[in-house]
Amino acid sequence: MQEQKNILVAIANPGDNTTLGFTTIRFSENRIVEGTALSHEEGSDENWINDSGIYEISYKLFGQKEGAGSFNFNAVLLVNDQTIEDTFNEGPVLEDVVNNRLTLTSTVILRLEEGDVLKLQGVSIEDILYNRARIDIEKIA
C-alpha cells in the first residue's frame, strides 16, 4: 500500500501583494493540495502545519522596483511569526539599473510541529513590489 503524499503548492499572482518592501506574502491560488498534513486558505499568508514532521519547503519570490537606482531585496521563512534566521536568502545589490527585477529561490528542510504557521516574508527597505511567488511544501518524514 502506497503512503499518502502530503503536498501543498500555493501561488501568488499579480495583485495579491500590494504592500511594498517588508511584508509577508499572500497566496491567492492553491495549485495542489494533497493529504491532510498541510492547509492554506486562498488569499492568506498563512500555511498551516496539521501534522508534526520534517518538511521540505521550496519557494520562488519575484521582486520588482519602479525606476532606475539601487535595488535589493531578501526573503526569509517565518514559523509562528518568528524569523528562522538560517533561511534568510539575500539578493544581490544592483546599482543604477533600469530593469529592476529579480527572483529569489530557495529550498530548505525544517522540522515543524502540529499547529505551526509557516509564512514567506519579503524583506527590503526599498519600495519592492512582490508581483509573483510560489511556495511548495511537502512532508517528507
Task: Identify the function of each model-found stretch.
Residues 1-141:
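Extracellular jelly-roll beta-sandwich "head" domains, especially the C-terminal globular C1q domain
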